[in-house]
């Protein structure tokens, strides 16, 4: 399961 750009973006929030 790879993380998408959005996934990483939300991870920062």
Swiss-Prot record:
Q: How would you summarize where this protein is expressed among tissues?
A: Expressed by the venom gland.
Methionine amide sites (modified residues): 13
Q: Which family does it belong to?
A: Belongs to the tachykinin family.
Q: Where in the cell is it found?
A: Secreted
Q: What are the transmembrane regions?
A: none
Q: Name one GO cellular component term.
A: extracellular region
Q: What is this protein called?
A: Tachykinin-like peptide-XIII
Q: Chief localization class?
A: secreted
Keywords assigned by UniProt, alphabetized = Amidation, Pyrrolidone carboxylic acid, Secreted
Q: Which PROSITE patterns match?
A: TACHYKININ
Q: Which residues form a coiled coil?
A: none
